[in-house]
């Protein structure tokens, strides 16, 4: 989560809508811009462009295709450190591959050995990019490719890039945080029956634990990410539903 959001300092989508340079009030003045900010945040956070916005439902939500490039540019101008991190991460991956020397960028690192490029996560877990190569992409830039399972579920050469590497790291770190939270919950004798994205579904007697107690377990920091703002919310009911 955004650190300021986790500390209760505002609405992340409304803050992202500040890129439109006008006041934004949910269900109020310029409230429609909050939705544009939400779409931009979800679609552009990992380097997405017009195609990403469209796949997130931008056109169905009333945005026009010719205004999408302006939204993308505004989001990137409002988030220069994120954009810089995309390119710094790609550079670190490329350098590790070319030189064989470990490259650290923020809390992650890249190493290249045994014919594999490794992304080293803060938890110590590693993501593998098998048989990497540098090849020109459709835009004429050199990009990193590797062997893996594509969207057609077949083994083939895959292309990655700055934003996608950051997405890999972000989702993998989030997974590691959730996995440790699930271990803590299980250690307290609670029965996890499923998990959906960042949610845990628990089947338990009504008087075993309160929602607040379970949220506290979910919000504990693993030893490898002390200081990272974590927050959890939950509900109890007779069946699962989206809160």
Per-range role (PLM):
Residues 1, 7-243:
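Conserved catalytic core of nucleotide polymerization and phosphodiester-bond processing enzymes
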């Amino acid at each position: 989560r955004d650190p300021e959001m986790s500390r209760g300092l505002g609405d992340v989508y409304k803050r992202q809508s500040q890129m439109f340079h006008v006041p934004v009030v949910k269900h109020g003045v310029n409230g429609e811009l909050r939705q544009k900010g939400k779409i931009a945040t979800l679609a552009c956070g990992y380097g997405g462009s017009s195609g990403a916005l469209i796949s997130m439902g931008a056109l169905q939500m009333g945005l026009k295709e010719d205004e999408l490039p302006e939204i993308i540019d505004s989001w990137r101008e409002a988030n220069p450190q994120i954009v810089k991190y995309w390119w710094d991460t790609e550079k670190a991956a490329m350098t590790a591959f070319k030189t064989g020397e470990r490259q650290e960028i923020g809390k992650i690192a890249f190493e290249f050995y045994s014919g594999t490029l490794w992304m080293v996560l803060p938890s110590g877990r590693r993501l593998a990019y098998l048989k990497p190569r540098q090849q020109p992409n459709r835009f004429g830039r050199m990009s990193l490719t590797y062997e893996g399972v594509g969207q057609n579920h077949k083994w083939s050469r895959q292309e990655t890039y700055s934003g996608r590497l950051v997405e890999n790291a972000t989702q993998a770190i989030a997974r590691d945080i959730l996995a440790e939270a699930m271990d803590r919950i299980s250690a307290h004798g609670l029965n996890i029956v499923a998990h959906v994205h960042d949610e845990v579904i628990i089947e338990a007697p009504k008087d075993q634990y309160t929602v607040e107690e379970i949220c506290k377990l979910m919000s504990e920091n693993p030893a490898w990410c002390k200081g990272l703002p974590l927050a959890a919310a939950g509900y109890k009911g007779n069946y699962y539903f989206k809160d």
